């Protein structure tokens, strides 16, 4: 008897290797923690929908990357260290602070956040970025130099 066109459990898509996890502490703002939880819930809902209707090979193949993403999100959530922004000092730049940078290019406002909530378009920079590293610990009126691809800049900082 031919086995062609028979759906075997062995036909399931193989598990993908885990996504790399950062070696740095997973500091998050309350907003960042909420975003991680929402991403995990959304991915779980998508997985559940696929498991319940995974009739096609394409749907089954979509499960492997989704399972990998779920493992990564669960690991990031379990390692999250929520920083209480209200307990941060207000006289210097710290994690979670929003800072106005005054330079020859004009004023820009940046918020220093965790790795997973960084978003260049929204001026939310990871605390590990060169800009955040230059700003951390600075006080209003301090001048700091930060390394960037376009060359070093000397900027005055004012905490907002």
What is each stretch, according to the model?
Residues 79-89:
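Active-site phosphate-binding and catalytic loops of NTP-dependent enzymes
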Residues 1-76:
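Helix-rich terminal scaffold detector
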Residues 5, 50, 64-67, 72-79, ...:
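Bulky hydrophobic/aromatic packing residues
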Residues 42-45, 79, 133-140:
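Short, intrinsically disordered, mixed-charge
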Residues 157-160:
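Conserved small/polar residues in nucleotide/adenosyl-binding loops
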Residues 12, 17-20, 24-27, 57, ...:
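Generic preference for well-ordered secondary structure
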Residues 87-155:
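Non-DNA-binding regulatory cores of transcription-related proteins
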């Amino acid at each position: 008897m031919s086995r062609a066109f028979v759906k075997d459990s062995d036909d399931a898509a193989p598990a993908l290797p885990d996504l790399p996890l950062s070696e740095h502490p997973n500091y998050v703002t309350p907003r960042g923690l909420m975003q991680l939880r929402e991403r995990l819930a959304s991915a779980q809902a998508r997985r559940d929908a696929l498991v319940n209707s995974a009739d096609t090979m394409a749907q089954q193949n979509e499960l492997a990357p989704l399972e990998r993403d779920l493992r990564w999100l669960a690991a990031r959530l379990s390692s999250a260290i929520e920083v209480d922004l209200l307990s941060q000092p207000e006289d210097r730049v710290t994690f979670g602070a929003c800072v106005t940078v005054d330079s020859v290019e004009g004023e820009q406002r940046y918020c220093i956040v965790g790795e997973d909530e960084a978003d260049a378009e929204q001026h939310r920079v990871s605390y590990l970025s060169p800009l955040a590293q230059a700003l951390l610990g600075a006080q209003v009126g301090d001048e700091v130099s930060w390394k960037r691809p376009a060359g070093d800049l000397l900027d005055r900082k004012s905490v907002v």
